Amino acid sequence: MYLKLLEEAGRLMKQAVADAGYTVEDMSLVESQHADVSSSLPFRLAKELKKNPKEIAAAIVEKMGKSEYIDRVEATGAYINFYASQKYITDSLKEILSEKKFFELEPNGIKVILEHTSANPTGPLHVGRGRNPIIGDTLARLLRAGGYDLEVQYYVDDMGKQEATIVWGYDHLDRIKPGKPDTDKPDHEIVEVYRAATDLRKSDEAVEKEISEILNAYEHMDPATAVKFREMVERCLEGQKMTLARMNVFYDRFVWESDFVRDGSVNKAVKKLAESQYATTKDGALALDLSSFGMDKEFVLTRADGTSLYTTRDIAFHVWKLARCDRAINVLGEDQKLAMQRLNAALSILGEKKAPTIVFYSFVSLPEGRMSTRKGVVVNLDDLLDEAVERAYVEVDKRRKDIPEEKKRQIAEAVGIGAVRFDIVRVAPEKSITFKWETALDFEKQGAPFIQYAHARCCSILEKAKPGEYDASMLREPEEAALVKKIAMMPYVIKNASTELKPHVIAIYARELAEAFNQFYRVSPVLIAEPELKEARLALVEASRKALAASLGMLGIAAIEEM
């Protein structure tokens, strides 16, 4: 409904601007803290026409027409402010409650491939890069709600030297002494084998040679070697998928790096790049001179023995991917910026007209306690999730002595996982983040538990009384109108967040929505109100429940009914 309000404000504004004698296309309409819709157009016109912006604003408002959704329009200084009418409130509540897909935009026909996480299959996911699946999955949920035809991909790096090291390690377990993981998850077992084999590789040239031979055999698709690689990588992926599923992160397709070697795509790309004017060779290795693209270092494509590198195979993957979508989006750590510049240059040399859109993120750090990342120790994401759930359990147990133990554990799991997801996604991806327990598990205002609690409160009210026929005109308190307006804004928020690829925007909105509901709840008793008013407020509680559930859903957080 807010999109309709913007449309109405734009229609009135365009006519008034023309009637006032100005010629402008962009009306500069935005949401505002001081009004329902605001325009700063007078500032822009004042700069162009060398006139007083306040006088321009007054002249435009004087010509303003009428709309059933707009109660009044005011010139406040140089701003033009629009205020929604009661009919807008009434119609918004009706549409929120009656429209099953109110929180989804119409399909736009744009095919998007979103790739995220794509961690090396060498062990468990760790906290530093734990931001990737959370950002990626939130973007996926936003893009789907935004009407995009989306496929979420995980690119499986199954051909690197790290993977060859693990294959060698499993073949020579009698020569290495892997540590014993404190869990049955296969990715934790894999990393112990990898560490032990790596230590031996560094100290024994013969081992290094054997690992190189294994990698070479795999690149040339030796059947027996290929089976070993696939088994090892799938085993590690199994453990990583368990972690991701626990965080409500899922994928449509796992794309294997080796497939692009097997089907000749890598050789085809290398051949074409080798024939380009940018190709150079040194000691048998093929590289690209990218100085004309503003990069000093050469981009190495193959080793001296002719085997390809990860970056080469990544080029073939992107050629394949770009041919299958209108837009490709990658979620990557900020340390990959140079690699992506080189990739885009190579794609340009190959004649690609499109390039992937990259959402870069800064890494997550843990500042205190036994899980501190400042000590240079890699902290597994599994450990962070376990810690979050245990801390959440303490809070739940403190508040709910009346419920069974199993129920407490279920709530703690939902609250703990939600706390991690929300605290990581609430900050813009490009900004660094320090994970703090006191913020993440804040039941009062800052964290996901605050939003989950608002949803649970809605469910508790609705369990006692179901909404029936209602008269929305009974909702006259400012907090009631503010809550309806906040709910009605969600499609607008989805549109902006999905278009601009800003997952933190929906997190901020969800928290503001929970706050708006709490403000309403504080001033507007529901169950003890007079019958007609009670029905109207119950309808608003149901609308709030739907909106809170939808916003939590887009954040990948469980909308629990009891806390």
Swiss-Prot record:
E.C. code: 6.1.1.19
Gene Ontology biological-process entries: arginyl-tRNA aminoacylation
Reaction(s) the record says it catalyses: tRNA(Arg) + L-arginine + ATP = L-arginyl-tRNA(Arg) + AMP + diphosphate
Motif ('HIGH' region): 119-129
Main localisation: cytoplasm
Top-rank EC class of the record's enzyme: ligase
Highest taxon of the lineage: Archaea
SMART domains tied to this protein: Arg_tRNA_synt_N, DALR_1
PANTHER family linked: ARGININE--TRNA LIGASE, CYTOPLASMIC, ARGINYL-TRNA SYNTHETASE
Family: Belongs to the class-I aminoacyl-tRNA synthetase family.
Entry protein name: Arginine--tRNA ligase
